[in-house]
Amino acid sequence: MQSEKFDINEVKRRMHGASQALQHELGGLRTGRASASMLEPVQVDAYGTHMPLNQVATVSVPEPRLLSVQVWDKSMVKAVEKAIVDSNLGLSPATEGQVLRLRIPELNQDRRKELVKVAHKYAEAARVAVRHVRRDGLDIIKKLEKAHEISEDDQKRLDHEVQKATDATISEIDQLLANKEKEILTV
């Protein structure tokens, strides 16, 4: 956003970005079900550098509680196995040739409650990001009105549009959180 003009679509895009970031973070939270996104944060020591797991292997979900990691290069199997074990996801791979199988253990009730708290923290951070975007948008509108570049009626209309976008995005964030919470607590 620029100080000399206001674009509601830019505000909506930035708010949507906060929602998308939350969706990505929630996808990484482990539930009792297998999900390929669980392994997204795993970094493998490959070819003298750290690489995301998805650049050296294919991750699939053959069963609801099983992940399968097909390593492309036979020489990388041990490095991938070590990266998964070191990732603090609580997963121990069973290696069969170039395929690693990861059984997803049941989560106990305490761990589920912990994960719900983490999900709430992620959601609150996303809400704060949305509020910052709203504040930035409202500040620009106020400056434009003070500089007499827009009328007071336009200011009120734009303020209302920004608030509507904020409410819609916060509602979307709340829905993402509710869905993830339900998924985590489902035994």
From Swiss-Prot:
By its UniProt entry, which InterPro entries does this protein fall under? Ribosome_recyc_fac, Ribosome_recyc_fac_dom, RRF_sf
Is the Kinase keyword given for this protein?
no
Instruction: List the subcellular locations.
Output: Cytoplasm
Q: Which residues form a coiled coil?
A: none
Example GO BP: cytoplasmic translational termination
Pfam families to which the protein is assigned, alphabetical? RRF
User: Which GO molecular function, any one, fits this protein according to its record?
Assistant: ribosomal large subunit binding
GO CC annotations, alphabetized: cytosol
Q: Which CDD domains match?
A: RRF
Name the keywords, alphabetized.
Answer: Cytoplasm, Protein biosynthesis
| Source species, domain of life | Bacteria
Report the family membership. Answer: Belongs to the RRF family.
As for what it does, the entry says: Responsible for the release of ribosomes from messenger RNA at the termination of protein biosynthesis. May increase the efficiency of translation by recycling ribosomes from one round of translation to another.
The UniProt entry, under PANTHER family, shows: MITOCHONDRIAL RIBOSOME RECYCLING FACTOR PSEUDO 1, RIBOSOME RECYCLING FACTOR
The name of this protein is Ribosome-recycling factor
What is the scientific name of the source organism? Rhodopseudomonas palustris (strain BisB5)
This protein's encoding gene = frr
